[in-house]
Amino acid sequence: MDKFRVQGPTRLQGEVTISGAKNAALPILFAALLAEEPVEIQNVPKLKDIDTTMKLLTQLGTKVERNGSVWIDASKVNNFSAPYDLVKTMRASIWALGPLVARFGQGQVSLPGGCAIGARPVDLHIFGLEKLGADIKLEEGYVKASVNGRLKGAHIVMDKVSVGATVTIMSAATLAEGTTVIENAAREPEIVDTANFLVALGAKITGQGTDRITIEGVERLGGGVYRVLPDRIETGTFLVAAAISGGKILCRNAQPDTLDAVLAKLRDAGADIETGEDWISLDMHGKRPKAVNVRTAPHPAFPTDMQAQFTLLNLVAEGTGFITETIFENRFMHVPELIRMGGRAEIESNTVICHGVETLSGAQVMATDLRASASLVLAGCIAEGTTIVDRIYHIDRGYECIEDKLRALGANIERVKGE
């Protein structure tokens, strides 16, 4: 397995170009199964999960090409099963189910794998598809969905806010007969992006970005061209990189209005932040950040995917900060690793109490999930001495060329190839 060797401390400064959002590109790629004509998707990041998705779509009979953009032609889909060998590495595969059953009347997806954070059941996806009239069976490790004729529009009230299930129901409902209303829908920018992509293909969706999404079913979706929105979590990660190192950064191809909660906390930490239509700049003027209190919650509140990075910020900040995780249990696996680097923190229930220290020291640490690994790499950039981050395949699932981008900011980082 590859690892990163990071030599610190470094002040990170310079420019970085933000990639397309993985969490929008994935549902959009799966939603392209609904289209009867070719689709061009621009600004798709080069990531392991994207490669897996393109392989999966190819296995279903979709024609997939990548040359700058990703081109998808799902006019000749002839296989309706997503097998375990591809699904096991990636939970997002469940998003194939809604489009398959909506367009072809059948689909089956192996129960998924992915990051090891807490309970992420597929129950809400199944609940939504059953409400739309699909017959669902769990057999031999597969979720199997079928329907006679078309799915039927329904009024669906979600028990809890779920990004994944909102995507499944919304994409399946585009081809259902009649109107579907999703109450307590997720409001994330990536949901809005997926809805806007479907609208570009001819779907009738309103209310995306609110907790009530309305979908009027249409008979077919055509082709189109769509550009994936910038990755707000990658943007936030690089802003934190500059903030913890007293540095200065300009993020290009960013979308500031998707990051309000994160930018507010960075300002509280003492960062000087400016924004334009597609850029964000942050300047710490060489200062240490101040500790901040953070509570994760569904969008538009503070995103759980930025929690690990802000835990690190608090560990090197002036003062004591509290970070409360309300979305996933078991999402503090980075904390013991950061403590090994000299961080001072204790975990009480779903809150980590961080006591800022002036410096961290390099150590051998292990990545446990995607965002935790990013925080360990950033910690290595500012720690005294050498840090080795193991199991970085997690990072490759969600950050495009992270070492190249960090190197451009002055980090001393290299990838050590595994056996």
From Swiss-Prot:
Domain of life from the UniProt record: Bacteria
Gene transcribed to yield this protein: murA
Biological processes annotated in GO: cell division; cell wall organization; peptidoglycan biosynthetic process; regulation of cell shape; UDP-N-acetylgalactosamine biosynthetic process
Gene Ontology MF term list: UDP-N-acetylglucosamine 1-carboxyvinyltransferase activity
Reactions catalysed, as given in the entry: phosphoenolpyruvate + UDP-N-acetyl-alpha-D-glucosamine = UDP-N-acetyl-3-O-(1-carboxyvinyl)-alpha-D-glucosamine + phosphate
Role description: Cell wall formation. Adds enolpyruvyl to UDP-N-acetylglucosamine.
Organism, scientific name: Enterobacter sp. (strain 638)
Main location: cytoplasm
Residues annotated to bind UDP-N-acetyl-alpha-D-glucosamine: R91, R120, P121, V122, D123, L124, K160, V161, S162, V163, D305, I327
GO cellular component, one term: cytoplasm
Residue numbers binding phosphoenolpyruvate: K22, N23
Modified residues (2-(S-cysteinyl)pyruvic acid O-phosphothioketal): C115
Protein name: UDP-N-acetylglucosamine 1-carboxyvinyltransferase
Subcellular location: Cytoplasm
Entry keyword Lipid metabolism: no
EC number: 2.5.1.7
A Pfam entry, by short name: EPSP_synthase
Enzymatic class: transferase
Keywords carried by this UniProt record: Cell cycle, Cell division, Cell shape, Cell wall biogenesis/degradation, Cytoplasm, Peptidoglycan synthesis, Pyruvate, Transferase
CDD domains: UdpNAET
Active-site residues per Swiss-Prot or TrEMBL entry: C115 (proton donor)
Family membership: Belongs to the EPSP synthase family. MurA subfamily.
Pathway, per record: Cell wall biogenesis; peptidoglycan biosynthesis
